[in-house]
Amino acid sequence: MAHKKAGGSTRNGRDSEAKRLGVKRFGGEAVLAGSIIVRQRGTKFHAGTNVGCGKDHTLFALKDGKVKFEVKGPSNRKFISIEAE
């Protein structure tokens, strides 16, 4: 008589939903006020001129213009600014 013992249960088999983080508007791209530029965890990018920072560190445009990425300061921080048109 052939018998197959039941397989044990596993504690795996879950995964969290992707959070869609990253740069949404790139350098030189035209944006309108309120447009999201970067979604991030922490301040990988810092807010420069005409850019606001949300409570989840999302960077967004405060004025219409073009996106500009720059590296500033002794610690080489990455800043994102909007050059108003």
From Swiss-Prot:
One of its GO terms (biological process) is translation. InterPro entries: Ribosomal_bL27, Ribosomal_bL27_CS. The keyword Isomerase does not apply. One of its GO terms (cellular component) is cytosolic large ribosomal subunit. Coiled coil: none annotated. It comes from the Bacteria. The keyword Transcription regulation does not apply. Residues 1-20 are annotated as: Disordered. Disulfide bonds: none annotated. Pfam families: Ribosomal_L27. GO terms for molecular function: structural constituent of ribosome. Keywords: Ribonucleoprotein, Ribosomal protein. Belongs to the bacterial ribosomal protein bL27 family. NCBIfam families: L27 (TIGR00062). This is Large ribosomal subunit protein bL27.
